[in-house]
Curated annotation (Swiss-Prot):
GO cellular component annotations of the record: cytoplasm; ribonucleoprotein complex; ribosome
HAMAP family in alphabetical order: Ribosomal_bL33
InterPro entries for this protein: Ribosomal_bL33, Ribosomal_bL33_sf, Ribosomal_zn-bd
Keyword line: Ribonucleoprotein, Ribosomal protein
One GO biological process term: translation
Protein name, as recorded: Large ribosomal subunit protein bL33A
Gene Ontology molecular functions: structural constituent of ribosome
Family stated for the protein in its record: Belongs to the bacterial ribosomal protein bL33 family.
Keyword set includes Nucleus: no
One Pfam family, short name: Ribosomal_L33
Species whose genome carries this gene: Geobacillus thermodenitrificans (strain NG80-2)
Amino acid sequence: MRQKVTLACEQCGSRNYTTTKQMGRLGERLTANKFCSVCNKHTVHRETK
């Protein structure tokens, strides 16, 4: 089963993206390099609670 997670920009804290991940990987946080429309550049986005 997959769980819905939200990705937030590390620089401004804006929650820009949602995605899903496996339930078995609950221990580690998901990170991705995505475009932030608030910062207007590519930044690291980290999974939020």
